[in-house]
């Protein structure tokens, strides 16, 4: 038995889960929020009960030390020596990393080099890695990249039709995100379908406040909706998804905004929030739409319509599809969105059961048994993928 910590460090937060492997039992989980403030919030789950403490946590290193001390004081571990490995979520691995990797000084340097591709996320991920290195210097640590799974995309999928030297000089290409989630749910789908993943053509719909679709053929990502950044693809909670690039100078001209200000609008004030004018939260929009709010209904239709189109295009790309998977907050819980997305896909062999579609937050087939294309709801589990990669790469167990 080994104990593995899965870590997701944000600029002012630190999410954690402690697994016992190989059983994949979650021993505890929690989050440190508002790091850098006097009223930081430390939340940990012990024996199913959430315990919360508000205290000053000046930086990530202090948050890590506090986390480890709490694991001991709550009797979850007896000493730091019981931690056998640590897995860190890293948002962007660029082209350098096509798999998770053991963290060395050289690897850390390479993660820093690709940070300009994810300036909001990678620096925070690096801070988390260094904080753990300070407190647990001899424990093997693994970086698990959101982008790595999509590194199997062929050139015709990842290249933009721009001057080729923009790719060779500046690394401008599609990278894709949510890779750890897409990998988990497609592997799990193969298990539930009882077929080798090498034989399957799968479309994975990771639908949360950020959303992306992936075409996965033979267990490998061959295309995905997000691009150079997570702004591309389908409309999302606050992100626009794909737009005509000529709109950016046009909006600048009409509003007097700078390029950065327009980008801020595209990232934070667009998507379902922009169309509805009321919220980026799907639950609010479903409620408002049910009460007759036309723009809330329109926001839901636009969101579903874009996903629907990606499913059709990826089915064409793979010359057919064996299963469609819904995952993440919206994908796992919203029967309304799933119904809107699946509506009209009977022409390609998708027959789904409205009664089965009422499922929320648990694994289920929502297609009829006779449906040639199966439809599954699979709750994602990025943390367990991180723990598995630590065991695999650090030769633990």
Curated annotation (Swiss-Prot):
Question: Kind of enzyme, top EC level?
Answer: transferase
Q: Which residues are recorded as binding substrate?
A: 89
Instruction: Give the UniProt keywords, A-Z.
Output: ATP-binding, Cytoplasm, Kinase, Magnesium, Metal-binding, Nucleotide-binding, Transferase
Documented EC number(s): 2.7.2.1
Keyword Cell inner membrane found: no
Binding annotation for ATP:
15, 206-210, 281-283, 329-333
| Localization annotation | Cytoplasm
Name the cofactor(s). Answer: Mg(2+); Mn(2+)
Tell me the residue numbers annotated for binding Mg(2+). Answer: 8, 382
Please report which protein family the annotation says this sequence is part of: Belongs to the acetokinase family.
Q: Provide the protein name.
A: Acetate kinase
């Amino acid at each position: 038995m080994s104990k593995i910590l899965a870590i997701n460090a944000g600029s002012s937060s630190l999410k954690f889960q402690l697994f016992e492997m190989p059983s994949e039992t979650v021993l505890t989980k929690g989050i440190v929020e508002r790091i850098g403030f006097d009223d930081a919030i430390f939340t940990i789950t012990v024996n199913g009960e959430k315990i919360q403490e508000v205290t000053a946590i000046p930086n990530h290193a202090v948050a890590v030390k506090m986390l480890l001390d709490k694991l001991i004081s709550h009797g979850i571990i007896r000493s730091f020596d019981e931690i056998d490995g640590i897995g860190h979520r890293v948002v962007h691995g660029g082209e350098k990393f096509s798999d998770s990797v053991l963290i060395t000084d050289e690897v850390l340097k390479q993660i820093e080099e690709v940070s300009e591709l994810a300036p909001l996320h990678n620096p925070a991920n690096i801070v988390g890695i260094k904080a753990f290195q300070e407190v647990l210097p001899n424990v093997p640590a693994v970086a698990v990249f959101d982008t790595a799974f999509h590194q199997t995309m062929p050139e015709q999928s990842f290249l933009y039709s721009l001057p080729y030297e923009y790719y060779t000089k500046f690394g401008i290409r599609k990278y894709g995100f949510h890779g750890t989630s897409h990998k988990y749910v497609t592997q799990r789908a193969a298990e539930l379908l009882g077929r080798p993943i090498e034989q399957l053509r799968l479309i994975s719909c990771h639908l949360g406040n950020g959303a992306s679709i992936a075409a996965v053929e033979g267990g490998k990502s061959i295309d995905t909706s997000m691009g150079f950044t997570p702004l591309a693809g389908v409309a999302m909670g606050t992100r626009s998804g794909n737009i005509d690039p000529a709109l950016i100078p046009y909006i600048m001209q009409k509003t007097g905004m700078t390029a950065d200000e327009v980008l801020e609008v595209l990232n934070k004030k667009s998507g379902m929030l922009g169309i509805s004018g009321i919220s980026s939260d799907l639950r609010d929009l479903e409620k408002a739409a049910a009460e007759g709010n036309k723009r809330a209904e329109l926001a839901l239709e636009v969101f579903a319509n874009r996903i629907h189109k990606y499913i059709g295009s990826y089915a064409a790309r793979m010359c057919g599809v064996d299963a469609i998977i819904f995952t993440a907050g919206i994908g796992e819980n919203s029967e309304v969105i799933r119904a809107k997305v699946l509506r009209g896909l009977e022409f390609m062999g998708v027959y789904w059961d409205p009664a089965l579609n009422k499922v929320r937050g648990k694994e289920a087939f929502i297609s009829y048994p006779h449906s040639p294309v199966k439809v599954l709801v699979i709750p994602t589990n990025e943390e367990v993928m991180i723990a598995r990669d630590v065991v695999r790469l650090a030769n633990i167990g």
